Regions:
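Extended hydrophobic secondary-structure segments that form protein cores and membrane-embedded regions
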Residues: 1, 15-22, 48-52, 257
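P-loop NTPase catalytic cores that bind/hydrolyze ATP
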Residues: 1, 87-171, 191-205, 241-244
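Conserved catalytic/switch belt of AAA+ P-loop NTPases
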Residues: 2-9
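Flexible loop/turn segments at secondary-structure boundaries
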Residues: 9, 23-28, 56-60, 136, ...
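Amphipathic alpha-helical segments of the small helical/lid subdomains adjacent to P-loop NTPase cores
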Residues: 9-12, 26-136
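Structural recognition of the conserved hydrophobic beta-strand(s) that form the central parallel beta-sheet
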Residues: 11-26, 241
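An acidic- and aromatic-residue-enriched active-site/binding cleft used to recognize and process polar
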Residues: 19-24, 54, 106, 131, ...
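Terminal-proximal interaction/regulatory segments of ATP-powered molecular machines
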Residues: 182-270
């Protein structure tokens, strides 16, 4: 405001440039109407130049980063890539999954969406791929935590949970993350396999609104196949978790959900 009202503005031109993680109006999206109007006045002093990476661009950046890291490809890479092609997942990133190893195809689809919705876009993306923070790609490799050489979806859950303090998500999106986080935090007496199921479903739920992936039994069976204990198959685990209230199945959408609530947005209506 001081810059705008300066008497010598014409003689001393000055441009203020800011880089935002969200659209300008999104920072006040969940505020009261009065604050939104005041925020709109501030927005009126700026000119927006929106920029959003395409899935192809993001996939290319991920592939180049992984190429520089020279990470060894999993032994069953060809088999997993063929399965991804059979499930018609290739178009999600407009890129061959071969270039994204050791990210499991579903992990490669989820990662950009999580970074844009719940992180800080490319900053979060490159931090996961290139840093040595706990739960990052390098940390998983150094601690021999990969699953048959793959970074799995539940690895992403653990990493983003640890770095949740740096999220720039909209309050409405952040609330959904908190709901899932609270649900899993309060889950006691579950096996490691059951926790992996819930973490995977939780991430699918967070990204399903963008059409990326949905937590149906076909995708869950594929991504959890290598982890399924012989004495406790996935179908039995899903039935047990549903009966104990940890998740629910929505038949009309063919999707498992961590939260029980409906799609009705009470906050928006109020």
């Amino acid at each position: 405001q001081l810059i705008e009202q300066s008497e010598n503005r014409k003689q001393k031109p000055l441009a203020l440039i800011t880089l935002q993680h969200l659209a300008f109006e999104d920072y006040a999206a969940d505020s009261a109407a009065l604050r939104q109007r005041e925020w709109a006045k501030i927005q009126g002093r700026f000119r927006d130049f929106p920029f959003s990476d395409s899935s192809r661009t993001t996939g290319f950046l991920m592939a180049r980063c992984l190429q520089k890291l020279a990470v060894e490809q999993p032994a069953n890479a060809s088999e997993v890539w063929a399965q991804a092609n059979g499930l018609e997942l290739v178009d999600q990133l407009s890129l061959r999954f071969e270039a994204l190893a050791p990210l499991h195809p579903l992990t490669a689809i989820l990662l950009p969406d999580l970074c844009s919705k719940y992180g800080q876009h490319e900053r979060s993306l490159f931090k996961f791929l290139g840093s040595s923070d706990e739960g990052s790609l390098q940390w998983l490799i150094n601690n021999d935590a990969l699953v048959d050489g793959w970074v799995m979806p539940w690895h992403l859950y653990d990493y983003f949970l640890a770095s949740a303090g740096s999220t720039s998500a909209l309050p409405s999106l952040a609330q959904r993350w908190i709901e899932i986080q609270t649900r899993l935090r309060d889950a006691v007496g579950l096996t490691g396999f059951e926790l992996e199921i819930l973490k995977t479903i939780g991430l699918f739920n967070l990204c399903s609104s963008s059409g990326a992936v949905r937590a149906n039994q076909q995708l869950l069976a594929w991504v959890l196949d290598a982890r399924e204990p012989e004495a406790y198959p996935l179908a039995s685990a899903l039935e047990q978790l549903s009966s104990t209230g940890f998740m629910t199945y929505r038949g009309q959408a063919d999707e498992y959900r961590i939260w029980r609530g409906s799609d009705f947005d009470l906050g928006e209506q109020v």
